[in-house]
């Protein structure tokens, strides 16, 4: 894999989530991007079991995530902590750990949509949902030939501006910790975790935007 930026795109004023996704997709196709299948990223939240919290320890959250790009892996991200990469049956282990972590089932969130290939870029435009309702839009852009974030951020930003306009993001926080080290799949999952947490907290407010 290369270096990836994950961001949220606001819903356009007077448009639905689906209509905004379609407009973004149309802009990509006009640039010459071609559809390359579908993708999905999901996240379930686990919190420290009540028995542990009652002992005076501060409650902690853990996010268990899956990404269709890595079908044999499961990612466990601790709140303000490390990212553990395990095999796909990690979910089964979490059931056995219910004395320590409990699943906050109402908080499951996921992004699903279409993958696009444009030259050396892989773009994923997804609808973020919680339960039956669409809560927002995610855009993931990967520059495939590079593995050092600092070496290609300007190129990533320039490409994102071509179809996102003024909604092009700033540098992701995870880039600040990488400096000149090699980018990894865990860095992408951290960005999705941050995006999902942001969307969980916000009301859907349409804005003027992509033209």
UniProtKB/Swiss-Prot annotation:
<keyword id="KW-0804">Transcription</keyword>
<dbReference type="GO" id="GO:0006357">
    <property type="term" value="P:regulation of transcription by RNA polymerase II"/>
</dbReference>
<comment type="subunit">
    <text>Component of the Mediator complex.</text>
</comment>
<comment type="function">
    <text>Component of the Mediator complex, a coactivator involved in the regulated transcription of nearly all RNA polymerase II-dependent genes. Mediator functions as a bridge to convey information from gene-specific regulatory proteins to the basal RNA polymerase II transcription machinery. Mediator is recruited to promoters by direct interactions with regulatory proteins and serves as a scaffold for the assembly of a functional preinitiation complex with RNA polymerase II and the general transcription factors.</text>
</comment>
<dbReference type="GO" id="GO:0003713">
    <property type="term" value="F:transcription coactivator activity"/>
</dbReference>
<keyword id="KW-0010">Activator</keyword>
<keyword id="KW-0539">Nucleus</keyword>
<dbReference type="InterPro" id="IPR013921">
    <property type="entry name" value="Mediator_Med20"/>
</dbReference>
<dbReference type="Pfam" id="PF08612">
    <property type="entry name" value="Med20"/>
</dbReference>
<protein>
    <recommendedName>
        <fullName>Mediator of RNA polymerase II transcription subunit 20</fullName>
    </recommendedName>
</protein>
<keyword id="KW-0805">Transcription regulation</keyword>
<comment type="similarity">
    <text>Belongs to the Mediator complex subunit 20 family.</text>
</comment>
<dbReference type="GO" id="GO:0016592">
    <property type="term" value="C:mediator complex"/>
</dbReference>
């Amino acid at each position: 894999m290369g270096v990836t930026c994950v961001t949220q795109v606001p819903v356009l004023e007077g448009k639905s989530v689906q209509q905004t996704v379609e407009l973004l997709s149309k802009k990509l196709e006009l640039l010459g991007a071609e559809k390359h299948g579908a993708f999905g990223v999901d996240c379930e939240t686990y919190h420290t079991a009540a028995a542990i919290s009652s002992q005076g320890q501060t409650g902690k959250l853990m996010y268990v995530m899956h990404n269709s790009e890595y079908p044999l892996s499961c990612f466990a991200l601790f709140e303000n902590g490390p990212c553990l990469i395990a095999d796909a049956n990690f979910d089964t282990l979490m059931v056995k750990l219910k004395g320590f972590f409990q699943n906050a089932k109402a908080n499951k969130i996921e992004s699903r949509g279409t993958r696009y290939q444009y030259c050396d870029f892989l773009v994923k435009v997804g609808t973020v949902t919680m339960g039956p309702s669409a809560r927002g839009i995610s855009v993931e852009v990967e520059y495939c030939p590079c593995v050092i974030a600092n070496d290609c951020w300007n190129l990533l930003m320039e490409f994102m501006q071509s179809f996102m306009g003024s909604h092009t993001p700033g540098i992701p926080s995870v880039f600040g910790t990488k400096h000149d080290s090699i980018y990894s799949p865990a860095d992408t999952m951290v960005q999705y975790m941050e995006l999902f947490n942001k969307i969980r907290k916000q009301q859907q407010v349409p804005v003027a935007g992509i033209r």
